[in-house]
Structure formats: structure tokens, C-alpha cells
């Protein structure tokens, strides 16, 4: 891919589309939205307003990382919206994964529209990439930035990366000068940790899975492994264990570590046994609510990478 030509075309396209209007971009700190943000910033400068929504479903340290990177280092107009209570309320009692994704998508858009009205933006730029809409079109699962969009969108949508795959987005990010800590980040689902909790989402469950997720990422990095994705899932199943001489009844965490080129297919990684043992030991030691850790060895297909 000739990235110079690609950037030139996209910058021209975004600049002509937005004109004298303003645009907002859905920024998560992941490689897709970060790349789309830098591309759009190149095109329209201060007419771009980056919107970062703290859903309550983010990775450990994510909000601080995003604010520091984009507001302090890139100098972008960054609007930080703390919408945690709003998302948890909207998901109360909801257990169906597809419904969860759609609700999260709807609340996302509501938040964006409110900010857009405040700043007078007409355009919403999103970091949607090819696998997102292919999976949504194929009815595999809704992606919050496509399937969750309401029929009547009050903002005009611009998706500059929609024909690219993840490996291409990483190349583009590198070309645009994004730091390695962003372009080499593991993919993270738009709905965040909400789809790594099976069943109803509560602040307590998110706290558990956030800690477990951080442990998995830390140990994978420490072992020098370079998977496509590595994460933890709270299964919502309690099992019997032993604590001292007493019977315990605690939560179960599944660990998923996969290799892939573009996310369309994936293989469970053959992780060294001592790494898995260290992950299991740390999760059960550091998170008192968890008593059992499982390793998922299923490929994609038949499974998807995320559990929901």
C-alpha cells in the first residue's frame, strides 16, 4: 500500500467533506480510533474535536493514558465525558450479548450527539475498519460503531479506515508517526469490558474482570509473547474450591490468548505452561472473588475471539 498517496487522498476527502463545519471523532485510545483521529487532525486541524467517553468499561489506566497522549502530547481538542453511571444504568438487567452491544452503541451515539450540539459539529468521524462491518453485515455480531447506530443519525458519518484491515491500520499509524505504544496495542472491543462479562454487567463484575485483564496483559508482555489479543473473561459461573481448610465458592475466569493477522480468523496460542500457571496464580491470589482460571483453546472459527 502506498501510504503517502492514501493519506493524501483521505486528507483531501475529509477536508472537502467537512468544509467550514466542525467534526467530532470517537476516540478510545485504541489503534483504529487513534489513527482516524490523527488522519482527521491532519485534514482539518482545530475543527476536529476528539470525544473520549469513559464508559466504565475501559482497561486499567485507560482514561489517564488517553488524556495524556492526545491532549498533552498531540495537543488536540479533547472532550472528556464521564458517562459511567449512564452506561451501567442502561445495561441494568440486560444479559443478551447482542442487546448489550446495541445499547452501548445507542448510548455512545447519544453522548456524541450531545457534545456535537454543544460545539456545533455536523460530522462524526469513526475508526470503523473492514472486519467491523463485514461481521455486522454477515450477522455474526453487531459492532458498537456500526450495528449500534440508530436509524436516524443526527450526525453525518465519515469512516476513513473502513476498507482497511488491522495490520494495514498499524502500518498507517506508524507512517503517521503515532507512538509504538499505540500502533502495537492489542485490539480492544468497542463495548470494552462489558462484553468480557457474561450476563448482566455490574460495577463489581467490571472491577474483577478489569484486574484479571491487566494481569493477563502484564504476564504476556513479561514473557515476551506477541499475540493478537490476550484477555480475561468473567464467566459468571461459580465453582467449588478450597481456601485453607474451608470450602470456597468463587467466580471463574477464562483466559483467551490468540494469534491472528487480521482478526478474521485466529488460532489459540500455544502459551508456555509456566506463563499460564503464573497468570492463574496471580488472578486467584490478587482477586479474592476468583477461585478458578481456565484457558480457552478454541480457534476462530468456530468461536469468535471475544466471548460476546
UniProtKB/Swiss-Prot annotation:
<dbReference type="GO" id="GO:0005524">
    <property type="term" value="F:ATP binding"/>
</dbReference>
<dbReference type="InterPro" id="IPR026598">
    <property type="entry name" value="GMP_synthase_B"/>
</dbReference>
<keyword id="KW-0658">Purine biosynthesis</keyword>
<keyword id="KW-0067">ATP-binding</keyword>
<dbReference type="InterPro" id="IPR014729">
    <property type="entry name" value="Rossmann-like_a/b/a_fold"/>
</dbReference>
<dbReference type="InterPro" id="IPR025777">
    <property type="entry name" value="GMPS_ATP_PPase_dom"/>
</dbReference>
<keyword id="KW-0436">Ligase</keyword>
<feature type="binding site">
    <location>
        <begin position="28"/>
        <end position="34"/>
    </location>
    <ligand>
        <name>ATP</name>
    </ligand>
</feature>
<dbReference type="InterPro" id="IPR022310">
    <property type="entry name" value="NAD/GMP_synthase"/>
</dbReference>
<comment type="function">
    <text>Catalyzes the synthesis of GMP from XMP.</text>
</comment>
<protein>
    <recommendedName>
        <fullName>GMP synthase [glutamine-hydrolyzing] subunit B</fullName>
        <ecNumber>6.3.5.2</ecNumber>
    </recommendedName>
</protein>
<feature type="domain" description="GMPS ATP-PPase">
    <location>
        <begin position="1"/>
        <end position="185"/>
    </location>
</feature>
<comment type="subunit">
    <text>Heterodimer composed of a glutamine amidotransferase subunit (A) and a GMP-binding subunit (B).</text>
</comment>
<dbReference type="InterPro" id="IPR001674">
    <property type="entry name" value="GMP_synth_C"/>
</dbReference>
<keyword id="KW-0332">GMP biosynthesis</keyword>
<keyword id="KW-0547">Nucleotide-binding</keyword>
<dbReference type="Pfam" id="PF02540">
    <property type="entry name" value="NAD_synthase"/>
</dbReference>
<comment type="pathway">
    <text>Purine metabolism; GMP biosynthesis; GMP from XMP (L-Gln route): step 1/1.</text>
</comment>
<dbReference type="GO" id="GO:0003921">
    <property type="term" value="F:GMP synthase activity"/>
</dbReference>
<dbReference type="Pfam" id="PF00958">
    <property type="entry name" value="GMP_synt_C"/>
</dbReference>
<dbReference type="GO" id="GO:0005829">
    <property type="term" value="C:cytosol"/>
</dbReference>
Amino acid at each position: 500500500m502506498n501510504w503517502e498517496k492514501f493519506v493524501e487522498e483521505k486528507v483531501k476527502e475529509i477536508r472537502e467533506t467537512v468544509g467550514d463545519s466542525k467534526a467530532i471523532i470517537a476516540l478510545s485510545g485504541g489503534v483504529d480510533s487513534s489513527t482516524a483521529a490523527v488522519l482527521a487532525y491532519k485534514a482539518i486541524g482545530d475543527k476536529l474535536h476528539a470525544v473520549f467517553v469513559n464508559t466504565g468499561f475501559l482497561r486499567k489506566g485507560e482514561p489517564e493514558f488517553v488524556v495524556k497522549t492526545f491532549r498533552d502530547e498531540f495537543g488536540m481538542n479533547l472532550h472528556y465525558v464521564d458517562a459511567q453511571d449512564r452506561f451501567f444504568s442502561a445495561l441494568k438487567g440486560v444479559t443478551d450479548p447482542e442487546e448489550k452491544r446495541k445499547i452501548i452503541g445507542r448510548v455512545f451515539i447519544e453522548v456524541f450527539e450531545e457534545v456535537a450540539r454543544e460545539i456545533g459539529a455536523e460530522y462524526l468521524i469513526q475508526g470503523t475498519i473492514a472486519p467491523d462491518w463485514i461481521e455486522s453485515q454477515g450477522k455474526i455480531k453487531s459492532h458498537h460503531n456500526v450495528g449500534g447506530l440508530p436509524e436516524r443519525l443526527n450526525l453525518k458519518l465519515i469512516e476513513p479506515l473502513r476498507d482497511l484491515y488491522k495490520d494495514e491500520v498499524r502500518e498507517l499509524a506508524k507512517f503517521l508517526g503515532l507512538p509504538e505504544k499505540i500502533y502495537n496495542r492489542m485490539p480492544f472491543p468497542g463495548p470494552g469490558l462489558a462484553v468480557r462479562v457474561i450476563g448482566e454487567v455490574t460495577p463489581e463484575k467490571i472491577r474483577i474482570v478489569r484486574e484479571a485483564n491487566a494481569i493477563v496483559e502484564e504476564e504476556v508482555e513479561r514473557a515476551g509473547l506477541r499475540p493478537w489479543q490476550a484477555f480475561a473473561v468473567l464467566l459468571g459461573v461459580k465453582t467449588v474450591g478450597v481456601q485453607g481448610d474451608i470450602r470456597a465458592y468463587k467466580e471463574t475466569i477464562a483466559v483467551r490468548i490468540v494469534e491472528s493477522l487480521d482478526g478474521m480468523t485466529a488460532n489459540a496460542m500455544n502459551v508456555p505452561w509456566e506463563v499460564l500457571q503464573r497468570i492463574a496464580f496471580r488472578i486467584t491470589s490478587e482477586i479474592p472473588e476468583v477461585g478458578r482460571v481456565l484457558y480457552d483453546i478454541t480457534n476462530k472459527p468456530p468461536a469468535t475471539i471475544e466471548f460476546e
